[in-house]
Amino acid sequence: RSTAVGGKGTEIAGVLLEKGIHVIQEHPVHYNDIVKLLKVAKENNCVYQVNSFYPNVKNVQEFIVKSNKLLKKSRPTYIDATCSTQALFPMISILGKALSGFHTWKLQTIDSVNSKFPFKVLSGEIRGIPAIVKIQNQLDPKDPDNNGFLLHRIVLGTTEGSLCLDNSNGLVIWNPQMYVPHAEGVLDMYGNNSYVELPV
């Protein structure tokens, strides 16, 4: 656990780097600590990296692969992403891999949200796609690993439907875009949507 969440992980990483031992540290790590540890690594001819971990989890990998395929066949319409404070860096990594990049982006805080709402809400665009990002901006310093409502929930909306990562260790859910043909006397909720034919 890093200094940012009350642990000694950053200190331990520094000692290892001073001995010339390569270090991969899981986020969250404070950016000042990252800069400091990169300098120590360079001075001792070794490597220091921060790992976002979650893009390597099976369900998250599935979401990333399916997002890449989906975006080759349809146009993105929105992103709705939610995470805990500890999982923000990995969420940026997940989004970057799902969208084949994160730049350019512009997000601003929405100040009109109910003050009791446990999430900080940001609105803007990621890669030109309208986006809402909600971050549970709460951390219990005595128990930083608990009290989070979720790790990640990401919905990628497209012209064909929405792909949802329910949680980092949850399900990947496909919801096809509803299409109602205008044929008199015929009620067909799906029409010719090719995504409805995909195996589940």
Named regions from a protein language model:
Residues 19-20, 43-44, 73, 101, ...:
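Structured helix-beta-strand junction loops
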Residues 14-15, 46, 200:
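C-terminal helix-rich "cap/oligomerization" subdomain common to oxidoreductases
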Residues 1-40:
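Beta-loop-alpha module in the N-terminal Rossmann-like domain of NAD(P)-dependent dehydrogenases
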Residues 1-4, 22-29, 51-61, 180-191, ...:
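Phosphate-binding glycine-rich loops and adjacent basic patches that engage nucleotide phosphates
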Residues 89-198:
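Contiguous beta-strand/loop segments that form the cofactor/metal-binding neighborhood of enzyme cores
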Residues 24, 30-94:
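A contiguous active-site-proximal alpha/beta segment in oxidoreductase catalytic domains
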